[in-house]
Amino acid sequence: LDVELDYFYKLTDNMLFSRAVAPSLGYGSLPVNDAKMENQGVEFTFKAHLVDTRNVKLDLRLNGAHYKNKMIEMPVDYYNADGTAVRQQMNGAMAVGHSMYDHYTYVYGGVDENTGDALYQAYYDSRYGGLGDDKGNNEYNYITSLHQWILDQEEAGVENPERFLCDTMFADMGYATLQYVNKSYLPDLNGGVGIDLDVYGLTLSVACSYQIGGYGYDYTYLSLM
């Protein structure tokens, strides 16, 4: 039995991003090298010599890898007049402490029993009123991006802003809240398995791949709904 086990760590910096610039320059953005991201994981390979005779050899191969990805520094959004850099808080689904492969999407809440419409989770700030009250609650109270809202509150000095969050279900996706859903495109484990058979000099090899875990998004199915 042959066994190989490897651990890897890679820090990537100077990634390619677009930075917004003044429209007076004649273009809206400028490609820049910025931000930092780390990748780390383990890889393994097993090879078992099941049959090893003069004329017949049979080997079984198995390999796999588990890895994760995380942003540790976001790109600069703009520079203040004194030259200090202000970094982006989010860029799409990317944010510090999260993987660029994390799903940042809406949460499906089932079907409305009365209308048959699909329901989606919507968060709102309880400090500005709830549903049907007299505190001026309206569509502007609903949070479109949950993680961005939390970052904005923390930047404003609000401690534990999550305590002000309330949620409800809406059939109108326009009120739904984008949020991390603890799912990633990255598989928990992926690799391959195969056999090598050698009989009197005639070799037959078979290889297959596998993946365990990882979540995709079916945009074709979405377009049909």
Identify the meaning behind each predicted range:
Residues L1-Y9, V42-L50, V56-H66, G191-L197, ...:
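Membrane-embedded beta-strands that build the outer-membrane beta-barrel scaffold
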Residues F8-L50, I150-V158, L178-V181:
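Outer membrane beta-barrel strand-and-loop segments of large Gram-negative receptors
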Residues L204-M225:
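C-terminal beta-barrel architecture of Gram-negative outer-membrane proteins
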Residues T168-F170, Y185-L186, G201-T203, C208:
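Segments forming glycine/polar-rich beta-alpha architectures that bind adenosine-containing cofactors
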Residues L1, E38, K183-G191:
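Short, glycine/acidic-rich beta->alpha junctions
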Residues D13, R54, K70-I72, T203, ...:
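Residue-level signal for secondary-structure boundary sites
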Residues L16-V21, I72-D77, Y217-S223:
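Outer-membrane beta-barrel translocator domains and adjoining extracellular loop/strand segments
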Residues V32-A35, V51-K183, L224-M225:
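Conserved small-residue
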